[in-house]
């Protein structure tokens, strides 16, 4: 599996980028959010990736953060949500906004994405509520402003990678962010969240 790619940005389009890695051009499908932040052609780029292998195709999806990739994996675990639909959702909602929409049962927020109708939006909310349910329980996290979404999402990803369950990780990260306040660094949030989760 290809977990990430670092290379020179050869070209971009409305829905994908091509990275030149050691002379090989990798076509990577990305959300509009990732493409808008990827930088100029010719620059050095690091993308976290998810590779899907099917009988007729091998497809690479690229993300600006591990948190966005984790959200993509959750979305594609829902019946009826393929890679393109997941990217459409992540084009209009960042990982933190998606977590809050699921926790709050806000199907209209999810249905803003192209190709997502009310029924699919409701299925996403229902199927992901248990997997992302801890977000609603984490004090302060559900109401966190968008500016903190990146830190909270990356901290959640870090704790999940260390083996904590989503509910445990969300509660610990939420408590850490509430205690540290605005402007807390990812390192500080993760350290405090680990102490809280270990109690």
UniProtKB/Swiss-Prot annotation:
GO MF terms listed in the record are: ATP binding; four-way junction DNA binding; four-way junction helicase activity
GO cellular-component term (any): cytoplasm
Q: Per the record, which residues fall in region Flexible linker? A: 144-154
Compartment list: Cytoplasm
Gene3D superfamilies, alphabetically? Answer: 5' to 3' exonuclease, C-terminal subdomain, DNA helicase RuvA subunit, C-terminal domain, Nucleic acid-binding proteins
Gene Ontology biological-process annotations:
DNA recombination; DNA repair
Q: What is its main location?
A: cytoplasm
Query: What UniProt keywords are attached to this protein's entry?
Result: Cytoplasm, DNA damage, DNA recombination, DNA repair, DNA-binding
Spell out the residue ranges making up region: Domain II: 65-143
Identify the stretch(es) annotated as Domain I: 1-64
The answer, when asked if DNA repair is one of the entry's keywords, is: yes
For the region Domain III, give the residue spans: 154-199
InterPro entries reported for this sequence:
DNA_helicase_Holl-junc_RuvA_I (IPR013849), Hlx-hairpin-Hlx_DNA-bd_motif (IPR003583), NA-bd_OB-fold (IPR012340), RuvA (IPR000085), RuvA_2-like (IPR010994), RuvA_C (IPR011114), RuvA_C_sf (IPR036267)
Whether DNA damage counts among this entry's keywords is yes
**Which family is annotated?**
Belongs to the RuvA family.
Record text about domains: Has three domains with a flexible linker between the domains II and III and assumes an 'L' shape. Domain III is highly mobile and contacts RuvB.
- What is the role of the protein in this entry? The RuvA-RuvB-RuvC complex processes Holliday junction (HJ) DNA during genetic recombination and DNA repair, while the RuvA-RuvB complex plays an important role in the rescue of blocked DNA replication forks via replication fork reversal (RFR). RuvA specifically binds to HJ cruciform DNA, conferring on it an open structure. The RuvB hexamer acts as an ATP-dependent pump, pulling dsDNA into and through the RuvAB complex. HJ branch migration allows RuvC to scan DNA until it finds its consensus sequence, where it cleaves and resolves the cruciform DNA.
UniProt subunit comment: Homotetramer. Forms an RuvA(8)-RuvB(12)-Holliday junction (HJ) complex. HJ DNA is sandwiched between 2 RuvA tetramers; dsDNA enters through RuvA and exits via RuvB. An RuvB hexamer assembles on each DNA strand where it exits the tetramer. Each RuvB hexamer is contacted by two RuvA subunits (via domain III) on 2 adjacent RuvB subunits; this complex drives branch migration. In the full resolvosome a probable DNA-RuvA(4)-RuvB(12)-RuvC(2) complex forms which resolves the HJ.
Q: What is this protein called?
A: Holliday junction branch migration complex subunit RuvA
What is the organism of origin for this protein? Answer: Rhizorhabdus wittichii (strain DSM 6014 / CCUG 31198 / JCM 15750 / NBRC 105917 / EY 4224 / RW1)
